[in-house]
UniProtKB/Swiss-Prot annotation:
It is a multi-pass membrane protein. Pfam families: G3P_acyltransf. Pathway: Lipid metabolism; phospholipid metabolism. It comes from the Bacteria. This is Glycerol-3-phosphate acyltransferase 5. The chain crosses the membrane at residues 3-23, 69-89, 116-136, 143-163, 168-188. GO terms for molecular function: acyl-phosphate glycerol-3-phosphate acyltransferase activity. It comes from Dehalococcoides mccartyi (strain ATCC BAA-2266 / KCTC 15142 / 195) (Dehalococcoides ethenogenes (strain 195)). It catalyses: an acyl phosphate + sn-glycerol 3-phosphate = a 1-acyl-sn-glycero-3-phosphate + phosphate. It is found in: Cell membrane.
Length: 233
């Protein structure tokens, strides 16, 4: 195991751990995003609590974290499996950032950045699936299905998509899926977690990315302050 690989894995975690959603919300709105909206430290909650422009800035940054770390690892001569591990460390850093006491976002945008470099076409199909579901306000199930489909797309349709080293890519996608599911299931407990059965809670968290079925109740349970600061963009 090379020193460069170890350094890049650690760097990936630290870069991933930069909580841009938290930082920009603090700077531009003066709020702790973990206390408002869904409580998620990610672009979607920034859109809800701080506006679309700020949310777009966070989304671009989070996607770039994953993509840049994979590309840099490749430029340094790391093997494909090592590049993927660096990408997974970057996603883990976003989800469990040391700077926020290991309570971060869901890592979807960062995972997209990693996936776009690993296998662009399947990643775009997964993104399209999430967007299609999002049009009907079902983004979380769309993300779940899109990410779950990635290993199958790379494994069974690698020839069609022109994916080399597809077995390694498929294992990388499985890693992304497992990290996503683990993060959803490890969401902090709240008052709603005790209003449903254990089985329903697991289903809701894993598939819907919330503790209860009602999306509107979930995302509006903590409203952001009314006062607005000037937009960053």
């Amino acid at each position: 195991m090379s020193l460069v690989f170890i350094i890049m894995a650690i760097a990936g975690y630290l870069v991933g751990a930069i909580p841009m959603a938290y930082l920009l919300s603090r700077w531009r709105r003066g709020i702790d995003i973990r206390r408002y909206g869904s409580g998620n430290v990610g672009a979607s909650n920034v859109v809800k609590t701080a506006g679309k422009r700020l949310g777009l800035a966070v989304f671009i940054f989070d996607v770039s974290k994953g993509a840049v770390m994979i590309l840099l690892s490749g430029a340094l001569g790391l093997a494909l499996w090592q590049q993927i591990v660096v990408g997974l460390f970057t996603i883990a850093g976003h989800n469990w950032p040391v700077f926020l006491r290991f309570n971060g976002g869901r890592g979807i945008a960062t995972s997209l950045g990693v996936a776009l470099v690993m296998a662009p076409v399947p990643a775009l199909i997964a993104l399209g699936t999430a967007i299609a579901f999002g049009l009907f306000k079902k983004m979380a199930p769309g993300v779940f299905l899109g990410v779950a489909a990635l290993p199958f797309m790379s494994g069974y349709f690698h020839g069609f998509f022109g994916i080399r080293e597809y077995q390694t890519i498929s294992w990388g996608f499985i890693g992304i899926f497992l990290i996503m599911v683990t993060r959803r299931l490890m969401a902090p407990d709240n008052e709603y977690a005790h209003t449903v059965s254990k089985a329903e809670l697991i289903f809701n968290r894993m598939f819907l990315d919330r503790d209860i079925r009602s999306r509107s109740v979930w995302i509006n349970r903590n409203s952001a302050p009314a006062e607005e600061s000037p937009n960053i963009l």
